[in-house]
Amino acid sequence: MTPLDAKRPLQLNHQGQLRHFLSLDGLPRELLTEILDTADSFLEVGARAVKKVPLLRGKTVCNVFFENSTRTRTTFELAAQRLSADVITLNVSTSSTSKGETLFDTLRNLEAMAADMFVVRHADSGAAHFIAEHVCPDVAIINGGDGRHAHPTQGMLDMLTIRRHKGGFENLSVAIVGDILHSRVARSNMIALKALGCPDIRVIGPKTLLPVGVEQYGVKVYTDLNEGLKDVDVVIMLRLQRERMTGGLLPSEGEFYRLFGLTTARLAGAKPDAIVMHPGPINRGVEIESAVADGAHSVILNQVTYGIAIRMAVLSMAMSGQNAQRQFEQENAQ
């Protein structure tokens, strides 16, 4: 457990309800299951002619993205809008941060605009925890991805994808393949899978892209793709994060694809009904063959759909937990 994850009680109110969503580490299985169940109920909203429920009417959700994103930012916007919240998205490239304003000052100024919730994506590990510790206690903080540390909503949408396609976790073999070292998605997935009872979690990649001590997550480590994929139910592919790499970790993308790219032939080693996932963006011909990404085993587009429902669940649950905490503190102050 990292020092960041040791701060996990910050996420819960006095009743054990979600008030911030910063990391999956340490969250009880019951709470993760509640998030999945709530998201399941929200999937129906997306099929309606009017895709809205009034749960966050009158609330303001501010998306503060210091890193580029398409799927995460857009699905958070849609999730908040479908909950009837007012939504602000900060364009960081034109914000005061480009003029030297600190992260803390930026959030303080946004807080003065009376936002009820911040969704924060940042290149630095721990940014979401820092904000949750220092902003007004009435404001809920949702981590949209921080450095290499965590991407909890991606982790949960991946769990929803697996549960909806496989029915549960208790008898599954799941392989996570690629750049494990730099992937916050891999960390969130390993934590969630273990908490939800998956008995066989595998990480597969070159030694240079496997974190030291990754076994502490309860995973089996493979450096041979064919061996690691044998009889798995779920394959989660990860992109090479060149922007986070330093030094010569890889000889070339072509060499990586030759050894670790998911092709139709290699997928044949998994179970016949295996599903293939990817958090995006996909690098075709680097970590995955187009025939696999677009094929019958792929549930990559389903992940995007489920992402809206998961983010609706997290936004609504965190706001409810904050409201309960506020009421508790007011009653005890009297």
Curated annotation (Swiss-Prot):
It catalyses: carbamoyl phosphate + L-aspartate = N-carbamoyl-L-aspartate + phosphate + H(+). PROSITE patterns: CARBAMOYLTRANSFERASE. The keyword Transferase applies. It is an enzyme of class 2 (transferase). Coiled coil: none annotated. Belongs to the aspartate/ornithine carbamoyltransferase superfamily. ATCase family. This is Aspartate carbamoyltransferase catalytic subunit. It comes from Pseudomonas syringae pv. tomato (strain ATCC BAA-871 / DC3000).
